[in-house]
Curated annotation (Swiss-Prot):
PROSITE patterns: PROKAR_LIPOPROTEIN. This is Uncharacterized lipoprotein YbaY. Pfam families: YscW. It comes from Escherichia coli (strain K12). A lipid is attached at residue 19 (N-palmitoyl cysteine). Residues 162-190 are annotated as: Disordered. GO terms for cellular component: plasma membrane. It is found in: Cell membrane. A lipid is attached at residue 19 (S-diacylglycerol cysteine).
Length: 190
């Protein structure tokens, strides 16, 4: 009986020795000198987002102070202004189309039957020059990736205000709510 115990102990010892030999080949990275993970740190939680690319239909050179605004809005109510769920505005800094974007949103703001739209616009010197002219449903009806194509805004004569400047406004019911270029700090990465 003692012989059986000794033989099985020897077999286990040989098996463990063989396993230990194999694991010696696996290299583990050494921790950096100044990094430490505390028990209170948690990994970053990634919020849901909508991403895509903004294209301009015509070949045009945008000036460095052009501002691209991408907006995610809830246009569920026909007789009310759309509710902006997420918006990002950045100076193009001389970069040209296409522009990639990622808009994070709060999923609690999106109702299952909501009409969620994605739109974009470009302003130059506080004047609207390019907009999306088609409805781009996302999230509930269209997924979370969408490409947008911008078209030129038709220029029309506008009455001059007493202050001497013309105004270009976006109706409050439009899903594209833009920020004036003077309100967007520069430089910013998109």
């Amino acid at each position: 009986m003692k012989l059986v115990h000794m033989a099985s102990g020897l077999a286990v010892a040989i098996a463990l020795a063989a396993c230990a030999d194999k694991s010696a080949d696996i290299q583990t990275p050494a921790p950096a000198a100044n990094t430490s993970i505390s028990a209170t740190q948690q990994p970053a939680i990634q919020q849901p987002n909508v991403s895509g690319t903004v294209w301009i239909r015509q070949k045009v050179a945008l000036p460095p102070d052009a501002v691209l605004t991408v907006t995610l809005s809830d246009a569920s109510l026909a007789d009310a202004p759309s509710k902006v769920l997420a918006q990002k505005a950045v100076r193009t800094e001389g970069k040209q189309s296409p522009f990639s974007f990622v808009l994070s949103f709060n999923p609690a703001d999106v109702q299952p039957n909501a009409r969620i739209l994605l739109s974009a616009a470009i302003t130059v010197n506080d004047k609207l020059v390019f907009i999306t002219d088609t409805v781009q449903p996302v999230i509930n009806q269209g997924g979370t990736k969408a490409d947008l194509t911008l078209v030129p805004v038709q220029q029309t004569a506008v009455p001059v205000q007493a202050s001497g400047g013309a105004t270009t406004t976006v109706p409050s019911t439009s899903p594209t709510q833009v920020n004036p270029s003077s309100a967007v700090p520069a430089p910013t990465q998109y």
